[in-house]
Regions:
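N-terminal basic/disordered segments at the start of proteins
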Residues: 2-40, 50
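Short beta-strand elements
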Residues: 32-36, 44-46, 149-151, 193
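Polybasic, low-complexity association/targeting segments
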Residues: 35-72
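Short beta-strand scaffold segments in enzyme catalytic cores
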Residues: 42-44, 136-140, 147, 236-238, ...
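A glycine-rich, hydrophobic loop/mini-helix early in the fold
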Residues: 57-125
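Flexible, glycine/charged-enriched surface loops at secondary-structure junctions
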Residues: 69-83, 128, 214-245
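Conserved mixed alpha/beta catalytic, RNA-binding, or beta-rich assembly cores of soluble enzyme
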Residues: 94-104, 108-118, 122, 126-221, ...
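Conserved, well-ordered active-site substructure
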Residues: 246-256
Length: 256
């Protein structure tokens, strides 16, 4: 684990009101834009503006998910894994599989799964592509990136995760009991999970966040993350107050 300052080529944050997006300046040769379809609100950094095409793709992606939920309301409501039928779309199946691996409901994987689906679809058109969906990110990149870890919106980020070109594509998904509107049964300020799968990173962030209630639980979180390594989890960062724990492929750098 390194704490040597690194050049910040781009950063993504977790924040309550998404005001952090105003501070995300794209690198030279890149643009940033927003894509909103119903409840899905994406912040994207790419080599060119792909917002129109992404909006159309997002409509098509959400349609089968909404139809499946209408026919199977337990998929939306359950806090535990559910079985899916043969009529399920790839997105619905990916979310269900990730939820089963982590012991949570399938909607715990939705933001990360959507971020990856969008990023993978448009990476051929923009090899440098960062898709952030409410603190859940999927990244393709030809250059180093630093992802800021924002546990306290008032204080700003002091640590970031350095990712090198060999690390991409990858997902970084977050869970917090103190930031944002997503359900967490824990009390942690920030759980950030790295994985190749967006659905898995998102589901794992929820599952690990549910474990973090006191500082004594930090070691429990890292042990649980390590147990999920065979499923595809590469690393975790956990913070509660002034205490942090890190496991796996998480190269931290100081920001500021």
């Amino acid at each position: 684990m390194s704490r040597k300052p690194a050049k910040k080529t781009a950063a993504l944050h977790l924040g309550a009101e998404r005001g952090y997006r105003r501070s995300l300046d794209p690198a030279a040769g890149e643009v940033s834009f927003q894509v909103v379809v119903e409840q899905t609100d994406l912040h994207v950094v790419a080599r060119r503006d792909l917002s129109s095409a992404m909006g159309s793709f997002l409509h098509g992606l959400r349609g089968p998910l909404k139809a499946y939920i209408a026919a199977h309301p337990e998929y939306l409501e359950s806090l535990a894994p559910v079985e899916v039928g043969p009529d399920a779309s790839p997105l619905v199946r990916d979310m269900a599989e990730a939820a089963r691996a982590c012991g949570v409901g399938p909607m715990a994987a939705v933001a990360g799964a959507i971020a990856q689906a969008v990023a993978d679809r448009f990476a051929p058109e923009s090899p440098d592509l960062l898709v952030e969906n409410g603190g859940d990110c999927y990244l393709h990149s030809t250059k180093p990136r630093t992802v800021a870890l924002l546990a306290d919106p008032a204080g700003g980020p002091s640590l970031g995760l350095l990712l090198n070109p060999r690390d991409f594509p990858c997902s970084l998904c977050s869970s917090s009991a103190s930031i944002g509107h997503s359900l967490s049964l824990g009390a942690g300020d920030l759980i950030a999970v790295r994985a190749a799968s967006g659905a898995l990173a998102d589901a794992a962030a929820t599952a690990l966040g549910n474990l973090l209630r006191t500082r004594r639980d930090l070691s429990r979180v890292t042990a649980a993350a390590q147990a999920l390594q065979p499923a595809g989890i590469d690393g975790v960062f956990a913070q509660l107050g002034g205490s942090i724990a890190v496991w796996g492929e998480m190269e931290l750098v100081a920001l500021g």
